[in-house]
Amino acid sequence: MEGFSDGYYDAQYTVPASDHRVEYPLSSSDHYAQAMMPFATPDQMHAAGFAYQSQIPDLVANSASFVFPSHTAGLSLNLPEHPMPAENLGDRTSNAMLLYDPLSALGGSTPTAINTGDPFAYNAFQSPFPAMSLENFQGQQSLSFHNTCLPSQPMNLNPSVAYSTMQTHGPILNTYQAPPRHAELTTSAKPTGTLDKQPSTNFPQPAGQTSQRRRNRGFQSSGPTPTHRFIQPKRPSPTKAPLPPHPKSAAGETSQYASIYSSSGFDIMGVLAEVVSRPNPKINIGAVDLSCAFVLCDITQNDHPIIYVSEAFERLTGYTEQEIVGQNCRFLQGPEGVVQKGMKRTFVDDETTSRLRSTIEDRTEIQASLINYRKGGQPFMNLITMIPIRWSSQEYRFYVGFQVDLVETPDAVTRRNPNGTYTINYQRSRLPNYVVPPPDLYRSHPDLTTWFTTDQVSTILKSLNNSTLTYRNYLDRVLVENTDDIIHALSLEGEFLYLSPSCRKVLEYEPIELVGKTLSTVCHPSDIGPVIRDLRACTTTDPVSVVFRIRKKYSGYIWFESHGSWRMGERGRQFMVLVGRPRFVYCLDHIASIGHGSLAETDVWAKLSKSGIVLFMTSKARPVLGRMPDELIGKSLQDLMDSRAEAQKALGVARTGQRVTFSHKIRHKKGHMLPAQTTLHPGDTKEGVRPSFLVAHISFPKPPQGGNDELNSAPPPNRNLAVSKIHRQAVSGVSGVAGQNMLASVKQANPQIQKLPFFTELVPTRGSSWQVELRELEKQNRTLSDELQKLLTRRKKRKRKQSTASVEKSCAICQTKKTPEWRRGPSGERDLCNSCGLRWAKQVRNAAQVAGRPNAY
């Protein structure tokens, strides 16, 4: 049997020492034993010189159900009464059928003291052991006889027959040498093969020849001899151990020594088998074994605590088993390891955590990427796969969560499944242990103190015109200490060497807290790879700009932009000096409330500063206003409007975080004015919060068709707001925007819609890389643009076919049917011939000049 060798028996089987004679009760099969073992007993043996302990080791005591005695029932164990001389040890013989020689497997037999009642071979003089008095040992041996019971183990004594029949034994307390108890020899315990007179071979043999052959085979010299068969226990049948505190009932006969091989008491192999063999799997996770980083959560308990954690998970997170077991998995969602139930997530994506919660409630499978934090605050991108399993019931009882760090092991993703999930190789043969740095490791106390106070800075600035003073030498230090941007220096390995005092205001960290740490401690785990790659790719003093997400100490992640260059030395690049500032991104959740009727193809969108300076304008400015977008960047939007005072008033309201809509006229490049309606939105905040920039939505209402000039001068009847009148709209009410009532009802039916941002790709806590998201958006835009172009081309072809098959046109004025070109008339359709159309256009133009206003024609 595998797993049992000479070293196992040599270390586990022990024989107590004794010099008195023990008379066992004789059984019905004693005459067989007496006929088969006719050898003499040694005359003398030292009771205190045994080489084996009289107490069994703890391992055997804990697993006694798998250790079996090798003697048969009724064999009298006659202990020697006198010690045997040492010079006679080499001439002793051993019986290969009844004695176990630990060194016989190596090709040699060890001189041992032979005992007719002892089934184990040992040498009393090889390795001296601490002596024990005879009286103490006799008392201990007598006590063991009264308290222990060793059931008999019948076997077939033919060595050619495999040892296939085993008996179920009771617990063995402190010794293997005990008299058999006949009360336990019941019918149910009787084996299928017992001692009898029938030979084990296929042909009959006389009993005398068989006994003589056994005696001849038993006598052997102490030199090298052929190895004999070892008496080995039967392999126990594999059964699942109980899972405390809710054990799983094992099928078949149970053992009182179950789960003695598992320190945790969990049948983890059974758990992984349930994961692999689960019915109707939704996610193909690939191969899993004990090298995976995973946890086991009990969803029947309150707050779904972790009840088992793998060793790889401890190495991945830096937390120990004592710190993990009993907690909910959400403790990894905070840098400090403390996240209360139901609180809003600041450092992770709240939408992803909501999906995880709903998945647990629905008892379904999920795979999602989420920012987690190791012990000490180190972030990492965790790809989580959660799978529910049943355990001895029809209801789901456990959730198995597998984790893998996508940044450190990007090759773990083997392939993409058709349903959007990924097949992950969770096996980690060499997962390094995350070492938590001590708090004082980085506190080298560099020169980060502020040199100049506010009064000293004022003195320096006032004395700049005085050439006799040397204050000009301190201007660089004054600039570094008082700028709003973070001036920082990075080493080639990405370690912070210096941070300006503005770090307290922008990132909420003290400069000394970050100096000595790497950029990965505060950078988004999905952005650290591209950032370091871009910085190291530059080998000259050319400026480099990087945009990434950085974690503030208390407020979560923000977008951050750094611009700088390398400082070169004699050996190349020494460090990089950068200037960083927060990068405010769009937060246009309220744009989702704009109805379909409020958007048009001719709308112009612009990004404005809080004072009205155009920072960006869409390409629709060229066909609508006749101006290139680059021409308008840097100019004031108020200069293009007819009412500058009303525009200033609207900007003042928009700076408070309110949404403002007003009507005005905007100047075309050719000089004429176009009626327009502008809505100012807060750019990077929700309504009610002061923004950093504004977003302007400029729409151009369509004038009513027809040649009535008086109607063209009036505002459109369906406009919600009057000309030059400012309307403030509260945060909770946007009744002036079409489609709001319908959206409000939808939000009431599904509250999750309110949490979805307009641009989900710009959420700072989003787990994916923003570069990848940008490339995907570009691909989607190209696909949509190509699809739109195909539809427009198909529409033109359809119109061309319809025009060829339509009835012949005739001029609405002269009724002619032949003309080189059809022109628009008073109806707005091309129903005038070339000459009539030119005359009508000239009349309209002359009438417009008389009225003193421009005309679209």
UniProtKB/Swiss-Prot annotation:
One of its GO terms (cellular component) is nucleus. A zinc finger (GATA-type) spans 811-836. Keywords: Activator, Chromophore, DNA-binding, Flavoprotein, FMN, Metal-binding, Photoreceptor protein, Receptor, Repeat, Sensory transduction, Transcription, Transcription regulation, Virulence, Zinc, Zinc-finger. One of its GO terms (biological process) is regulation of DNA-templated transcription. Transcription factor that acts as a blue light sensor. Plays crucial roles in fungal growth and asexual development. Involved in conidiophore formation, sclerotium production, and conidial stress tolerance. Promotes conidiation by inducing the expression of brlA and abaA. Positively regulates the fungal pathogenicity towards maize. In blue light conditions, inhibits aflatoxin B1 (AFB1) biosynthesis by down-regulating the expression of key genes such as aflA, aflJ, aflH, aflO and aflK. Induction: Highly expressed in conidia. Residues 306-328, 479-542, 608-642 form the PAS domain. PANTHER family: GATA-FACTOR (PTHR47429:SF7), PROTEIN TWIN LOV 1 (PTHR47429). This is Blue light receptor lreA. Disruption phenotype: Reduces the number of conidia. Increases sensitivity of conidia against thermal and oxidative stresses. Decreases the expression of brlA and abaA involved in conidiation and increases the expression of aflA, aflJ, aflH, aflO and aflK, and subsequent production of AFB1, under blue light irradiation. NCBIfam families: sensory_box. InterPro entries: PAS, PAS-like_dom_sf, PAS_fold_3, Znf_GATA, Znf_NHR/GATA.
